[in-house]
C-alpha cells in the first residue's frame, strides 16, 4: 500500500521499494509472491551475503549462489538495492554489474556483527553503482566514511585503499542511487538545484582547507554533532540547533515512553 501511495504522490519527496530481508529467510514461494505483487517501475532492497550462513544455506537449499538465485527470480535490476554483498565472487559481481543493480556498503554494521569485509573496492573498480550506508548502526555519515576508510585499508593491507572510493560512494554514489527513484537532481550545490538540501556545519579548522584537502578535513575533522542548521527541499528544519518543525521536547518524551513500554513488553 505504501509503494502505491508513493507512486501516486506528486511531491517527489517519497518513494517506495519492495522490502525483502535476506535469501536465507525467503522461500521460493515468497520470492514468487514478491514478483507478483511488486508494482511496475519499482525495485527491491535486500540483504545479500551479509553472513557466511546466508551463502551456505543458499548453496545447500537451492544449489546456487545468492546473486544467481536473485537473478533467476528477476530480483536484480537498475531499481534494486543490494545491501552488504560480503560473500560474493567475481561472477556474482559481474552479474550485479551486467544487470545495473545497486549495492550499498555498511562498514560499521559488518564489523559490529563480525560478518567480514566485502570486496567493495573491487565493486567500485568494476563500475558497479555503489553507495555508503549504515544499516542502522549509526546516523552519522562522516563516521561511516571514516570507518569504511580504515576498514578497507586494514583488510587489503594497503594504506592507499579507499581514499578516493569511499567519498565517491558517499557523495556521488548515494545521489545517483537516490536519483533512480527521485526526479529532482540530488547531490549538488548550485543555484536553481531543485532539491535545495543543505547542512551547515560549525567547523573552523586551524589548518588550511581547500579543494585539494577538503576530503581529509571532512573525514577527520567533521562529525554529525557539528551540524548547526539543516535545510531540506528549501525548507529550514533546524536553525542554530533549534528544531523548527516540531515540538522537540514532546517528541523526545514520547520516544522515551515508547521505548520504556517496548522494553517492558520484550522483557515480560
Language-model regions: role of each:
Residues 88-91, 95-129, 133:
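A conserved active-site cap/scaffold subdomain adjacent to cofactor or substrate pockets
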Residues 32, 68, 93-94, 121, ...:
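Alpha-helical segments flanking ligand/cofactor-binding loops in enzyme cores
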Residues 1-86:
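Metal-coordinating catalytic core of metallo-dependent amide/deamination hydrolases
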Residues 170-268:
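Active-site microenvironment of metallo-dependent hydrolases
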Residues 72-75, 79, 121-204, 222:
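His/Asp/Glu-enriched, well-ordered alpha-helical/loop segment
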Residues 52-64, 92-97, 114-123, 138-156:
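Histidine/acidic-residue-rich catalytic or RNA/ligand-binding cores of hydrolases
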Residues 29-40, 96-107, 257-265:
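Short, electropositive alpha-helical surface patch
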Residues 18, 47, 82, 96, ...:
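Divalent metal-coordination and catalytic microenvironments
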Amino acid at each position: 500500500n505504501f509503494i502505491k501511495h508513493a507512486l501516486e504522490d506528486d511531491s517527489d519527496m517519497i518513494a517506495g521499494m519492495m522490502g525483502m530481508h535476506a535469501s536465507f529467510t525467503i522461500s521460493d514461494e515468497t520470492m514468487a509472491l514478491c514478483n507478483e505483487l511488486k508494482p511496475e517501475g519499482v525495485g527491491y532492497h535486500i540483504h545479500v551475503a551479509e553472513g557466511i550462513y546466508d551463502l551456505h544455506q543458499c548453496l545447500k537449499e537451492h544449489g546456487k549462489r545468492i546473486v544467481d538465485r536473485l537473478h533467476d527470480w528477476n530480483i536484480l535490476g537498475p531499481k534494486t538495492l543490494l545491501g552488504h554483498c560480503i560473500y560474493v565472487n567475481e561472477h556474482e559481481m559481474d552479474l550485479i554489474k551486467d544487470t545495473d543493480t545497486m549495492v550499498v556498503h555498511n562498514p560499521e554494521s559488518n564489523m559490529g556483527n563480525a560478518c567480514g569485509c566485502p570486496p567493495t573496492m573491487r565493486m567500485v573498480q568494476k563500475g558497479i553503482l555503489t553507495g555508503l550506508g549504515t544499516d542502522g548502526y549509526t546516523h552519522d555519515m562522516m563516521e561511516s566514511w571514516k570507518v569504511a576508510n580504515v576498514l578497507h585499508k586494514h583488510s587489503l593491507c594497503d594504506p592507499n585503499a579507499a581514499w578516493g572510493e569511499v567519498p565517491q560512494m558517499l557523495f556521488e554514489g548515494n545521489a545517483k542511487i537516490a536519483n533512480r527513484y527521485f526526479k529532482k537532481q540530488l547531490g549538488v550545490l548550485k543555484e536553481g538545484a531543485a532539491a535545495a538540501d543543505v547542512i551547515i556545519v560549525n567547523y573552523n579548522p586551524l589548518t588550511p582547507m581547500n579543494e585539494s584537502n577538503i576530503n581529509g578535513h571532512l573525514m577527520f575533522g567533521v562529525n554529525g554533532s557539528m551540524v548547526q542548521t539543516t535545510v531540506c527541499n528549501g525548507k529550514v528544519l533546524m536553525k542554530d540547533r533549534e528544531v523548527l518543525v516540531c515540538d522537540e521536547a514532546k517528541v523526545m518524551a514520547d520516544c522515551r515512553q515508547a521505548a520504556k513500554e517496548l522494553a517492558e513488553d520484550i522483557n515480560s
